[in-house]
Design a protein with these regions (language model features):
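Solvent-exposed loop/turn and edge beta-strand elements of beta-rich ligand-binding domains
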Residues: 1-263
Length: 263
């Protein structure tokens, strides 16, 4: 018969706790450990494929402990609200830990670094719990993925006749994505100006009709949004197209423009 009170503290990961005194006995209990897998998606499309020349690769996620007691991860103890591990996504936008990284308990995934071409704004944290040994908690479905907004910008310009400095109206320019090949046409107004900005012409007005300067422009498969730029993060080729207005003039050679900053 064991009498008296035995008090001990387990501070290291292991299978065996030994209580010593006038009597000695051992208790063996293995800690439940699991892992987590998360998916990065495009906010506008909901897809696991990026827009333009952006990428979902190398998104950084911090895994934070929400446990009142310290947890042991890779040989180190972490307190509540401390980052226990940072993981990064692969080319498919998936990041995963091993199946035994995290001990039993509650954790949170927070995006700490956005991938190239995306904003960190709007990326919501995801909470999850480790309850089964050797199981990787799957957060790759649409309901649990973490979403990012693609950077979007606009292009504007002025068409002037060489030698005359006269501004040319109704001149079409084709804008083509170097990554996807998607292309749309913008047309200069009476002052020889063109722009893809919603302040110039709503993205929603005759979207991509390309007939007049008042037709809106929008690249991508998501619904046009006047609060955003028309062109996703990418490199674009601008080509002047032949028309009556530029008849007799040599066309401007095609040139490239990079959209890399939001708005």
């Amino acid at each position: 018969q064991i009498k008296g009170l035995y008090v001990t503290q387990i501070t290291e990961d292991g299978d065996l706790a030994v209580l010593s005194g006038s009597n000695q006995f051992s208790v063996s209990d293995k800690v439940i450990r699991g892992g987590v897998k998360i998916q990065k998606r495009d906010l506008e499309t909901g897809d696991t494929k990026p827009q333009g020349s952006a990428t979902l690769k190398d998104t950084a996620f911090d895994i934070i402990s929400l446990n009142d007691n310290s947890v042991l991860v890779e040989g180190k103890l972490y307190k509540k609200n401390e980052v226990v591990k940072t993981i990064r996504t692969d080319i498919e936008g998936i990041a995963s830990t091993s199946s035994d990284l995290l001990p039993y308990g509650k954790f949170r995934i927070v995006e700490s670094e956005a991938p190239d071409g995306y904003l960190t704004d709007g990326a919501k944290p995801i909470d999850f719990t480790i309850t089964e040994n050797g199981k990787i908690v799957d957060l790759t479905d649409e309901a649990h993925s973490i979403y990012n907004q693609i950077k979007r910008g606009d292009i504007e310009g002025v068409k002037i006749g060489a030698g005359t400095h006269k501004r040319l109206a109704d001149v079409p320019f084709r804008i083509t994505s170097k990554t996807t090949g998607e292309n749309h046409v913008v047309v200069t107004d009476d002052n020889g100006q063109f722009s893809t900005s919603a302040d110039w012409a709503s993205h929603k007005h005759n979207t991509n009709a390309g007939k007049t300067s008042e037709d809106g422009v929008w690249f991508g498969t998501s619904e046009p949004d006047d609060s955003k730029g028309a062109l996703p993060y990418d490199t674009y080729i601008i080509e002047e197209m032949r028309c009556d207005s530029n008849k007799g003039f040599e066309l401007i050679p095609p040139f490239e423009i990079v959209v890399s900053r939001n708005n």
